[in-house]
A protein has these predicted regions:
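Charge-rich, well-structured scaffold segments of protease-associated domains
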Residues: 1-138, 144, 154, 164-165, ...
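Short amphipathic
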Residues: 148-157
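Generic hydrophobic alpha-helical scaffold/packing signal
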Residues: 185-188
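Short, intrinsically disordered, charge-balanced linker/junction segments flanking boundaries
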Residues: 190-196
Length: 196
């Protein structure tokens, strides 16, 4: 299984502890040897295009992408994680391979294991299955986030509902005050009955 956020990709596996070596081998194979056949890319492209259309048809979801696009204008954090139709149409086998080889390198990776496995065994497995990786890290320096000045935007759509987003800059994720902020966020806009 895998998922992607705006800043990371996670490939993971859940398995009986006796199968740890096989799981590490499979994950390393995915990361190091993916071939991206054009036929499979086309199938996946259609799935993602459908996700994009579904998302755009759901104003309660799309409003967050619109908001992030405005507040992080000019920064990749403002981009929709699914991409755009235009971007997807340009992605082919070679583009996927280049992306994988430039970013999926040991300097950018963390191998993490939890469960019934000895630490020394995990290190041996990591060495065995990940040491053949190439080390051609392409530096993509982080673009500093510059928040847009105060703004207000109204977007009219054909809907029976209205949606709003209010956001303010806060402190970084390593600041200890984040826990109070998480509590406040849940109280103001948490799921269902939690919000005030």
């Amino acid at each position: 299984n895998a998922y992607t956020t705006k800043e990371e990709t996670l490939v993971y596996s859940v398995f009986p502890s006796g199968n740890m070596e096989r799981a590490v081998e499979l994950i390393s194979d995915l990361v190091m040897n993916s071939v991206f056949p054009e036929k499979e890319l086309e199938k996946e492209r259609e799935v993602v295009l459908e996700e994009i259309h579904s998302y755009l048809d759901t104003p309660s979801e799309a409003i967050y992408d619109d908001f992030e696009d405005m507040i992080f204008s000019g920064n990749s954090l403002g981009h929709n994680i699914l991409g755009t139709e235009e971007c997807l149409s340009r992605m082919g086998t070679e583009e996927c391979r280049r992306y994988l080889k430039s970013l999926y390198v040991p300097e950018n990776m963390v191998l993490f294991a939890v469960g019934s496995i000895a630490e020394d065994k995990m290190f041996r497995l990591a060495e065995r299955y990940f040491s053949p990786m190439h080390h051609t890290l392409v530096r993509n320096p982080r673009v500093p986030v510059t928040m847009s000045p105060v703004f207000s935007e109204v977007k009219s759509i054909d809907s029976h509902q209205a949606h709003t987003v209010v956001g303010v800059p806060t402190f970084g994720m390593h600041d200890n005050r984040k826990y109070a902020l998480l509590l406040l966020n849940n109280m103001l806009g948490g799921p269902g009955m939690n919000s005030r």
